[in-house]
């Protein structure tokens, strides 16, 4: 009898370019043998990463210009992600980037919530960081320096440093042979 794998939901705004988008896809590829991995994205416009063989769900709520439209988008994304979480019942939801982190912490349906702080640009809004930390089980940092600053400057204690080893970083993003 096959053992049931834990369910992992990765949340990202888009997969068009950038560092955390690449980390999201690499994380899915690395963990897919041990977890039932699904990537949820807010828009499938201009996908730049190879997602063949991965379970990907487009929530189809792309970015909008203007404050009112952005606020409406937060509500739409929250509703859609909450529905997806209820359907998939993830054991862990890990989000990449401030936009995805916000929606992740606003949808506490089931399982653990992890939010990712990947750069100093993410640290520009202390009140948002405190919200992420308060509503996250773990705040995942890509460096010891960022984790230290979150603890020292903002009193955020639930941090972990997680990074891909050089072996994983140097691997190509094309799908592995079946």
Language model features with spans:
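N-terminal strand-loop element at the rim of the active site
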Residues: 5, 10-18, 22-71
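Short beta-strand scaffold positions
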Residues: 41-42, 94-95, 141-142
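Carbohydrate-associated surface elements
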Residues: 145, 165
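Short, charged/polar "capping" segments at the starts of alpha-helices
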Residues: 45-50, 123-124, 148-149
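Short His-centered aromatic/hydrophobic patch
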Residues: 74-77, 94-101, 117
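Single conserved hydrophobic/aromatic residue that forms the stacking wall/gate
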Residues: 167-178
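A conserved, positively charged/aromatic
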Residues: 68, 85, 112-144, 154
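Glycine-rich phosphate-binding loop signature in dinucleotide/nucleotide-binding domains
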Residues: 84-91
């Amino acid at each position: 009898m096959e053992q049931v794998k834990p369910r992992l939901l990765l949340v990202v705004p888009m997969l068009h370019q950038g560092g955390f988008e690449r980390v999201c896809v690499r994380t899915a590829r690395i963990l897919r043998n041990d977890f039932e991995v699904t990537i949820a994205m807010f828009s499938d416009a201009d996908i730049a990463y190879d997602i063949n063989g991965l379970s990907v769900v487009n929530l189809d709520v792309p970015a909008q210009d203007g404050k009112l439209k952005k606020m409406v988008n937060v509500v739409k994304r929250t509703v859609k992600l909450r529905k997806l979480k209820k359907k998939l019942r993830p054991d862990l939801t890990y989000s990449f980037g401030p936009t995805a982190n916000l929606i992740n912490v606003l949808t506490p349906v089931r399982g653990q919530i992890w939010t990712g702080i990947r750069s100093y640009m993410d640290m520009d809004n202390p009140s948002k960081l405190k919200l992420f930390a308060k509503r996250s089980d773990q705040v995942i940092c890509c460096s010891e320096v960022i984790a230290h600053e979150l603890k020292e400057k903002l009193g955020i204690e639930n941090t972990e440093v997680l990074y891909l080893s050089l072996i994983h970083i140097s691997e190509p993003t094309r799908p592995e042979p079946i």
